[in-house]
Amino acid sequence: IYIQIIEIVDNEGPEIVCPADFSHTTNGHHCTADIWMPAAVVFDNCSDLVTVTVAYPGGFGNSNGGFYATLPVGANIITYTAYDECYNSSQCTMTITIQDLTPPVPVCDDHTIVSLTLGGQSGLTKVDASVFDDGSYDACGPVTFRARRMDSCIDFDWTTEGAGIDEIHNGVVDSRDRGTVHRPKVPFACCDAGAGPIMVELEVEDASGNLNYCMVEVNVQDKIKPIITCPSDITISCDYP
């Protein structure tokens, strides 16, 4: 009689299939998203009990999904690990992409007064768009500014013969020259002085390219002293005429 010992060994990890990749937007006032983690599909030929853990940026879960995870903006790699009763393990990964689709919050000055600063025919002033800001912000980072006039002095010569603005150097006045498209600076000239409030639209952009807008009233003042040129000296005879 011979005794034969046959040992059955399980060296294979469970089969695990991760959920499909997906995208989600950030929460309204935070640069993160609270995601309900989905469950992976797991199966093992030898074990009835398979445990799953989930690792994600900044955290760890001891269950096969079924909990909320707070994820930052960007591509987040999620790792699922399945363990059978023989301590074999298998892994799979998925990607959850968090996008910032929330526009920034624009805050404008109610009213701005601009004084002309240059002499000559135009009295031109270019005002940085950021001057019209009064605390605009975005939950995910810094914002940038551009602005435009809502209308312009149509009869005023904004090219090199007047205000000296000709962005594409063609000698023709266009919307860029008049300041009616969003630019880093907004032009004002002597034709604006005393003309009443000029409406300016401030464009606020966040790092993800989301845009939002607010309006400012601008009054232009002409504080430039007039230029006077006296006639040449003359000599008049006492016998005149």
Language-model regions: role of each:
Residues 1-241:
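Proline-threonine-serine-rich low-complexity tracts
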